[in-house]
């Protein structure tokens, strides 16, 4: 069973609108400069029991909450994919969007999805994927919704439909 390193009930930095952010414990990447290195340990935090997932669902069940963001640690580590699927499914049941921050690349995940039902499921449930390891030398506090310039903000439904990577564009951005 996966562990939860923490929950932010009304996050505003982890995607658009007001969101519920869930940090899953355990990370194989262990990026230097990570802002959440205590969550690298898979045993950190509290177990993500069915009751804990119900609690997250109740936090999501408010009209002012736009969506769920899954972070870590690494929410898409093999040990965490099942919990991420359960959390994302709870969000979708309430018609909330799902953002996932991962150190894996979109290309890595598409390759995994080719052979893994779990990775196919989580990609189908995901609206936006912020991919790539945090790279300290490319860190920039001015970046919106990502920590380092190498990371990409990907529109997953459009990418799956068009069979190519499609970057997410903020609906209200002025170009």
Please provide the spans of the model-predicted regions.
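N-terminal [4Fe-4S]-dependent radical SAM core
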Residues: 1-23, 32, 36-42, 165-175
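Conserved Radical SAM active-site core
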Residues: 2-5, 18, 36-121
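Flexible glycine/acidic-rich beta-alpha junction loops that bind and position SAM and/or redox cofactors
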Residues: 13, 109-110, 137-146
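Structured loop/turn residues at beta-strand edges in well-structured enzyme cores
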Residues: 29, 63, 124
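Glycine-rich nucleotide phosphate-binding loop and flanking beta-alpha elements
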Residues: 76, 136-137
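P-loop/Walker A phosphate-binding loop and immediately adjacent motor/lid segment at beta-alpha junctions
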Residues: 79-84, 88-95, 99, 139-175
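Short, conserved loop/helix-junction motifs that constitute active-site signature segments
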Residues: 120-124, 147
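Well-ordered beta-strand positions
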Residues: 127-128
């Amino acid at each position: 069973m996966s562990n939860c390193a923490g929950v932010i009930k009304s996050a505003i930095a982890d995607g658009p609108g007001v969101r519920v952010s869930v940090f899953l414990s355990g990370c194989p990447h262990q990026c230097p400069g990570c802002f959440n290195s205590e969550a690298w340990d898979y045993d950190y935090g509290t177990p993500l029991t069915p009751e804990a997932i119900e609690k997250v669902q109740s936090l999501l069940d408010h009209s002012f909450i736009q969506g769920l963001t899954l972070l870590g640690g690494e929410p898409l580590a093999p040990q965490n994919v099942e919990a991420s699927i359960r959390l994302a499914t709870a969000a979708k049941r309430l018609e909330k969007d799902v953002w996932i921050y991962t150190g894996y690349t979109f290309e890595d995940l598409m390759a995994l999805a080719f052979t893994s039902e779990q990775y196919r499921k989580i990609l189908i449930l995901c609206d936006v994927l912020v991919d790539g390891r945090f790279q300290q030398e490319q860190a920039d506090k001015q970046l919106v919704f990502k920590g380092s310039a190498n990371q990409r903000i990907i529109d997953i439904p459009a990418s799956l439909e068009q069979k190519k990577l499609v970057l997410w564009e903020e609906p209200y951005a002025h170009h």
